Amino acid sequence: MNELPRLPFDNPAILGIAPQMRALQKEGPIVRVRTAGEDAWLITRYDEVKALLSDRRLGLSDPKPERAAKSTARITMMALMAGDDYDREATEHPQMRELLVPRFSTRRMRVMKARIEQHVDELLDQLAASVAPVDLHRALSFPLPTMVVCDLLGVPLADRERIGQWARGTFDQSDSLHSVNTFQQVVDYMMELVQRKRTEPGDDILSELIAEKDGTLSDEYIAHLGCAVLLFGYETTIVRIDMGVLLMLRNPAQRALLAENPALAPAAVEEILRLAVGGKGSNALIPRYAHSDITVGETVIRTGDAVMLAIGAANIDGHAFPHADLFDLSREKPKAHMAFGHGTRHCIGRVLARIELTAVFERLFRRLPNLQLAVPEESLRWQEHRITGGFDEIPVTF
């Protein structure tokens, strides 16, 4: 009997999906694979991934959680998404979305856009005044999303650096004790902030949640929602800024187009979101569990089966995107990528993330037209120990 392909697949590249993932995608949309905890179905093609993302028969929670091997960081992530309990997921996750979706209103996003653009201008001013080489990650990619999510939550300026460091530590899979301790620091801080805002409300998400449901939401529950916004509201944007810069530097013709015409920034952002997935040690997978039988092609996924949705592979599926590997700002009416998911679990903060990325890429190469890596790309270190991956350093000259 042939041995099943084993996840995670080896991926020597900083950008892009694993070669084995590409090979499996060519063979068909669904294949049985082995993971650390259990066997699973791997879905690699665009149409099937999109359909399953919106299929209510798939859920976050495992009906037999004791069999699945999960890091402490992943357990924390599942709990924040109300996906750690099979019996409660169907009610708790929709309730979370019902409370949080209005917090990302058009009015608030309009206000946030002006503030984000100001943050980007200030960070680029500081970067341009520095002596090269400069760490772009520390100067721009990390502080911007941290500022933005702290603006949303009403976190005081003095607390933002430590909040960002705690949040990063929470998703560290290499040290369970550190992950637990930093997450507890985030929870404790959020509880204190909620209690402070009960007497000193502001124009922020926590203050609005305190007033929601006639003030009946508990401090603990509001703090839980605040932790979810914080932890999911900035880490992936940090990674995408870094990877977007690398994509631009790899594609000088597209970079020149953007520098000449900043109106192409939204198109650049969509290509970054589509292609800046994967990376060394990452397969860009969304784990789900079948809550009832599902048929994909001629294969039946049985109730309780684990399913891995390969977002990175779906986003470079040649059936959906002509010349899918090309970074191309001139794509005409491209299909929607799935960097933010799809369907009932579509990322709540996707509009905000797009605003942040657009503000960065409208400005970065106009302000720093000679921006280049200060080290060979292959020397950049992908953080395999972090759930979201990414880099801790991007040295550049300008």
From Swiss-Prot:
Q: Supply the SUPFAM superfamilies for this chain.
A: Cytochrome P450 (SSF48264)
Name the chemical reaction catalysed here: pentalenolactone F + 2 reduced [2Fe-2S]-[ferredoxin] + O2 + 2 H(+) = pentalenolactone + 2 oxidized [2Fe-2S]-[ferredoxin] + 2 H2O
Among the Pfam families in the record, one is: p450
Species = Streptomyces exfoliatus
**Residues reported to bind heme:** C347
What phenotype is described for loss of this gene?
Accumulation of the precursor pentalenolactone F and lack of production of pentalenolactone.
Keywords, in A-Z order: Heme, Iron, Metal-binding, Monooxygenase, Oxidoreductase
The name of this protein is Pentalenolactone synthase
**Reported function:** Catalyzes the final step in the biosynthesis of the sesquiterpenoid antibiotic pentalenolactone by mediating the oxidative rearrangement of pentalenolactone F to pentalenolactone.
| The protein's Enzyme Commission number | 1.14.19.8
Pathway it acts in? Answer: Antibiotic biosynthesis; pentalenolactone biosynthesis
The record's comment on protein family reads:
Belongs to the cytochrome P450 family.
Alphabetized InterPro entries for the sequence? Cyt_P450, Cyt_P450_B, Cyt_P450_CS, Cyt_P450_sf, PentlenlactSyn
Question: Which coenzyme or cofactor does it need?
Answer: heme
As one GO molecular function, the record gives: iron ion binding
* One GO BP annotation of this record: pentalenolactone biosynthetic process
Gene encoding the protein: penM
